[in-house]
Amino acid sequence: MLQIIQYRKAASLDEAMELLSKNRMNQIIGGMMWLRMQDRTIPVAIDLCDLGLDSIEETEEGFLIGAMTTLRTLETHTGLKQYFGSLFQDAVKDIVGVQFRNTATVGGSLYSRFGFSDILCAFLCLNAEVHLHKQGKVSIEEYAKMGYERDILTHIFVRKEEIKTAFACVRKSATDLPVLNMSIARNNDELRLVVGSRPKRAILYKKTWTNDFESLAKEMAETVPCEDNMRGSKEYREKLVYALTLRLLKQVSEEEVA
């Protein structure tokens, strides 16, 4: 059972950071969708809802996504769809349901960096960076490898690119956590492949485009480190890496990159 001793609505990021630093058990609550299922006591729950972090701002260079932006907003944003196709819609459509996605936040999903995260898998194939209150700007690739530190994720910035993207995953049942997820981004001959739910955190692989899909799929299956867990064996995941790599390569080859 989750118990919260004190609830504080931060008036500024500095105040939120100060509250977070006072006790290692204090917590930024985000959308509270995963947090509420934990059995723990939080001395001070810190809410960022009044700090204007719940919108997506489009600029000439890219999209600045606030950490409190909901997954539903990410899913339905027309600007993101124009530049990145159905990447985000495909990544979030199986995350429980619309009601859940109306509350779950992008920042909470990315900060957690769960191995099964469809959100991390989708962002990792893009030219993106996270903005942290203390540490500043960090590339999404570097952030995916970092340990957990006492900091506040405020924004995610995604640069506009002329790319073709796709997302694929395998689940045992609809809305279940993925057995394996993958994303891809193609910019002419530059290829970025991401494999997540291995079951560890998603990993980015940078490759050169080839029409020999079979060879690249076999290479990925042999390269990606997979492990066993309750949802699937190491061997099963390796076969999924092969199959999903083939599927994604075919998807980004179907149309010319804009």
Show the residue positions of the predicted features.
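C-terminal structural segment of proteins
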Residues: 1-258
